[in-house]
Design a protein with these regions (language model features):
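Beta-strand-connecting loop/turn residues
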Residues: 57-58, 84
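Short beta-strand-centered aromatic/proline hotspots
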Residues: 46-57
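Short, solvent-exposed secondary-structure boundary/capping segments
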Residues: 58-66
Length: 112
């Protein structure tokens, strides 16, 4: 399977220039990224989520986890990026919490 690279936005630099608009995780959060976590990156056209599939000291590889509008790559494609490109992190535990919350809200709607 092809692994895409792109001219990813440097989220750390953008956070320095525009702290109210661009988030950047702490070093501890970056160090604790695990396989299965969701990471938000951007190619300058849109920000999107990828699920981490591989991680080493130099780069990460993730699977695109949402539909994209403007890119040559699409849902489920693999992309390679660095820590400096990460805007946000959702851990596996975060995702499970939000999923359970969504399921519970759907159950409540069905009862009404």
């Amino acid at each position: 399977m092809e692994i895409f690279t792109d001219d990813w936005v440097d989220a750390k630099e953008m956070n320095y220039k525009y702290p109210d608009t661009f988030d950047y995780p702490t070093q501890i959060e970056l160090d604790n990224i695990a396989i299965g976590d969701s990471i938000k990156i951007s190619n300058g056209l849109e920000r999107f989520w990828v699920e981490v599939k591989e991680k080493n000291k130099i780069y990460l590889i993730g699977r695109v986890d949402n539909e994209l509008i403007t890119n040559e790559y699409k849902l489920n494609d693999l992309v390679m990026f660095e820590n400096k490109n990460i805007y946000d992190i959702r851990t596996k535990e975060d995702k499970q919490f939000y999923f359970k919350k969504l399921l519970n809200s759907q159950k409540l709607k069905k009862r009404k």
